[in-house]
Amino acid sequence: MSLWPYADSSYTPPQKQYEEVSLDDDITLTGHSIVKYRFRGIEHETTSWVEMYTEVLKELHNGNKAYLNYLADADDSVDLSIQVTRSPDEFSSSVKIDDDIYIWTGTATQYKVNLLRKFFEQYKQDPSDLVFFLDDSKGIGSDEEIER
């Protein structure tokens, strides 16, 4: 018994479409799952809001190392200074950005987004240069997911 041969086809399944939201959009992002982001025209895969937040800050910092160094040494009266420290033990949750520069990451998603807006303003970066790709079909399974 013989079967029909496979037909030649150029069909490719459509790529999954994600909701795109830029940093300058007025939308609450808490509870949304991020799968990737585009910063300065380059797309990056990501597993969490924390990862995106720290990678974007690293890129901003690499362009101008003076600002985060200033914040790390400033007193708490300086806006954003409570987000940056020289010691990883100062925060309950932090990520290393550079030598002796740590960013507080134990915050809610929307708080991170609001901080990015402030950092973009200080770095004179256009907020439309950061676009989030959201996949809400993943759903929210745990408290940890919500905080990410």
What are these regions (language model features)?
Residues 5:
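Phosphate/dinucleotide-binding and metal-coordinating scaffold of catalytic cores
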Residues 8-148:
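Polyanion-binding interface signature
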